[in-house]
Amino acid sequence: MKGTLTRAALAAGGMMVTSAVMAGSLALPTAQSLAGQWEVADSERQCQIEFLANEQSETNGYQLVDRQRCLQSVFAAEVVAGAGPDGIALLQADGSTLAFFSRDGDLYRNQLGAGDALTLKALA
């Protein structure tokens, strides 16, 4: 019985450590780390947007500047950005998610539908 409790305690302790390590590895990028010029592209066009280091507390996101109104034409809404542990979300003014871009190497990808995809890439 004592051995069973010891094994159970070790297993539970191991799960807690694993959870902490997993949670620690999924850090959210800061506004400063995403700040700068980015390119949004699909099969027909590409345009530049800019992430600013200003946080938007009402949406839990970061300020995004779309001077060419590229994203507004795709999503028909004002867009702000939000970071996720495994990608970047484009948010509406109320904080709801319009699109999520998953990390794919040095860029982020959003699959809109069958064959249609948007990519988001930081410009150096």
UniProtKB/Swiss-Prot annotation:
Belongs to which family? Belongs to the protease inhibitor I38 family.
Function per UniProt:
Inhibitor of the alkaline protease. Inhibits SMP by formation of a non-covalent complex with a molar ratio of 1:1 and shows a high specificity.
Coiled-coil regions listed in the entry: none
GO molecular function (one)? metalloendopeptidase inhibitor activity
- This chain belongs to the protein called Alkaline proteinase inhibitor
A GO cellular-component term linked to this record: periplasmic space
Q: Which gene encodes it?
A: inh
Superkingdom of the source species: Bacteria
Using the record, list the residue span of the signal peptide; answer none if the entry has no such feature.
Answer: 1-24
Cystine links in this protein are 47-70
Spell out the subcellular localization from the entry: Periplasm
Q: Which InterPro entries match?
A: Inh, Inh/Omp19, Protease_inh_b-brl_dom
Q: How does it assemble?
A: Monomer.
Which keywords appear in this protein's UniProt record, sorted alphabetically? Disulfide bond, Metalloenzyme inhibitor, Metalloprotease inhibitor, Periplasm, Protease inhibitor, Signal
The organism that produces this protein has a lineage beginning with: Bacteria, Pseudomonadati, Pseudomonadota, Gammaproteobacteria, Enterobacterales
Quote the Pfam families the UniProt record gives.
Inh
